[in-house]
């Protein structure tokens, strides 16, 4: 019961020592808990730091704290350099008791820190992908520890790393979820409706019926699809070739309304080609479904409905987001179609019907966290629906009905997902059960990049052998010894995987190869990486070579 939280956090703050909590609950519940914790810290003469992954959420958190009687500072990348400097100075001058911001705020010069709150702790945006790389959640943990403050990680669906910390006794979990607030969830097997579903639309008869029922009730319907554009790609009907980005060697996303194709990685756009560059055929056809294509199908099926689309094409500026929010709040939309951007709005109007046309999108990518991301996205979609007792329904379309993420969402039971996913991670020896370092070698000449990556891998394997880690079979990818105690094992075995071309082997005109270093001891893994990197730094760098190190990478693809 969340009503117990004020007493819980009050007792923890009385200790004047580092402590950590993991809160799982709906957005409104987490916000209430944040306000209670902030007030308790301020009453004890301590200051509060709140960190979240995106600018919009930071603004909402600051507004909520202000409405509760506090006047927080707000720090994020949307401010000008002068505005950020002013906020930084105010934080240093102790003129405000609360600072709210995106990941950069975790470094703000706040003294007397009593509470560090990380909202949406599973959000990948908390990881800075540019050098110097850091994860704001882990920096927050270190700050709280150094300042003898209380750390609270909060989310609707905590990361596997945080759940593992709870299981190891490193954090205390507070689960504040009301089962009565869940909608009715139905799973649709797309394989059973392949003939009845219009090609490329992913809109099966049951999904259409769900939308129709919401319209009959004059209620809101939402369709969530984490793929923008009219279709994923264009492909040649004769030879199968797809238009690709010249700089990144990845397929270009097709946008019908603006009649252009765009690279998802470098952002380059160009007009839709009128023929195949490989065989000169004129049969270029869209393949796959994006939000734009779903919107077209919905408008065709429900011509009188007021339809809105939320993705990177329609919401480009804060003003666009505000305009959409006003339309929604005024009840001027019947059907909303969107990507994950839907979850950034903090929608107040919950829908009578939420449909997920393609739950499997994003699952089949070379990233061991793909199932976890899919599960989190589905749970976010479920949160958009009204409770079952108020008529709320969610329909999830999939071709993988027995996937543990789908089964967990349908059952409303996190443990179904967590147990199976942890078993997979254990079997494949991936975080959080091991530590992972990704090494990227990039340059303008592919043969030089491949040679340098091979050299780095050879140096790493030599270090493994010289360190006496015979259990890893000279670092060739053999299994790590099993740990009986999970975290904190003393075994320092290391596995070297690769080198191999990166999932997207060329980006912005640079070729990239990767090496993965898995270890039971992160310190030992980092030690051999740093030592071998120093050797490479002393060697020549033909082809504009760059050697990058990413400890605990969040994005693998």
List each language-model region with its residue ranges.
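Helicase-associated low-complexity/disordered flanking segments
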Residues: 1-4
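Inter-lobe coupling/hinge segments of SF2-like helicase ATPases
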Residues: 6-11, 16-97, 102-450, 513-515, ...
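Short beta-strand elements
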Residues: 308-309, 464-469, 492-502, 543-552
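Surface-exposed amphipathic alpha-helical segments in non-transmembrane regions
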Residues: 414-415, 421-423, 460-461, 522, ...
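AMP-binding (ANL) adenylation modules
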Residues: 428-430, 503-506
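Short amphipathic alpha-helices in soluble, non-transmembrane regions
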Residues: 452-458, 527-535
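Intrinsic disorder/low-complexity segments
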Residues: 466-491
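Short, low-order "capping/linker" segments at domain edges
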Residues: 491, 505-518, 551-557
């Amino acid at each position: 019961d969340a009503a117990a939280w004020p007493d819980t956090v009050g007792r923890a703050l009385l200790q004047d020592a580092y402590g950590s909590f993991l809160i799982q609950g709906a957005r409104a519940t987490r916000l209430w808990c944040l306000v209670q914790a902030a007030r308790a810290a301020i009453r004890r003469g301590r200051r509060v730091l709140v960190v979240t992954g995106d600018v919009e959420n930071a603004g909402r958190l600051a507004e909520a704290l202000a409405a509760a009687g506090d006047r927080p500072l707000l720090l994020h990348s949307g401010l000008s350099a002068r505005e950020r400097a002013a906020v930084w100075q105010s934080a240093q001058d102790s003129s405000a008791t609360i600072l709210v911001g995106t990941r950069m705020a975790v470094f703000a010069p706040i003294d007397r820190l009593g509470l560090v709150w990380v909202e949406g702790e599973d959000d990948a945006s908390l990881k800075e992908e540019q050098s110097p790389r850091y994860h704001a959640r882990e920096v927050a943990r270190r700050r709280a520890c150094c300042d003898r403050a209380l750390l609270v990680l909060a989310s609707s669906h905590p990361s596997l790393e945080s759940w593992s910390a709870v299981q190891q006794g490193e954090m205390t979990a507070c689960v504040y979820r009301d089962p009565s607030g869940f909608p009715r969830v139905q799973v649709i097997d797309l394989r059973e409706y392949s003939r009845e579903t219009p090609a490329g639309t992913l809109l099966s008869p049951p999904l259409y019926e769900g939308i129709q029922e919401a319209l009959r009730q004059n209620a809101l319907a939402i369709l969530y699809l984490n793929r923008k554009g009219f279709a994923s790609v264009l492909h040649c009907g004769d030879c199968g070739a797809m238009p690709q980005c010249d700089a990144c060697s990845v397929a270009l996303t097709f946008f019908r309304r603006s009649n252009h194709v765009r690279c998802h990685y470098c952002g380059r756009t160009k007009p839709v080609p009128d023929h195949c560059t490989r065989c000169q055929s004129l049969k270029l056809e869209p393949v796959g479904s994006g939000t734009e294509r779903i919107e077209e199908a919905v408008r065709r099926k429900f011509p009188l409905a007021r339809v809105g689309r939320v993705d990177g094409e329609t919401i480009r500026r804060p003003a666009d987001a505000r305009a959409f929010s006003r339309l929604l709040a005024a009840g001027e939309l019947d059907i909303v179609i969107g990507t994950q951007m839907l979850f950034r709005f903090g929608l107040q109007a919950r829908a009578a019907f939420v449909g997920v046309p393609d739950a499997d999108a994003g699952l089949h990518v070379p990233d061991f966290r793909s199932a976890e991301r899919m599960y989190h996205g589905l749970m976010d979609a479920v949160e958009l629906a009204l409770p079952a007792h108020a008529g709320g329904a969610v329909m999830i379309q999939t071709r993988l009905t027995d996937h543990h993420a789908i089964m967990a969402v349908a059952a409303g039971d996190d443990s179904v997902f967590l147990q199976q996913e942890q078993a997979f991670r254990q079997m494949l020896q991936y975080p959080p059960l091991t530590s992972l370092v990704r090494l990227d070698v990039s340059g303008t000449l592919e043969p030089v990049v491949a040679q340098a990556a091979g050299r780095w891998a050879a140096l790493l394997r030599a270090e493994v052998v010289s360190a006496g880690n015979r259990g890893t079979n000279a670092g060739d990818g053999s299994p790590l010894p099993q740990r009986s105690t999970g975290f904190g094992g003393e075994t320092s075995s290391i596995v070297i995987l690769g080198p191999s071309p990166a999932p997207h082997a060329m980006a912005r005109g640079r070729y990239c190869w990767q090496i993965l270093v898995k270890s039971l001891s992160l310190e030992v893994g980092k030690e051999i990486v740093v030592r071998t990197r120093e050797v490479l730094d002393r060697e020549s760098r033909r082809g504009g070579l760059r050697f990058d190190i990413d400890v605990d990478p969040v994005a693998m693809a």
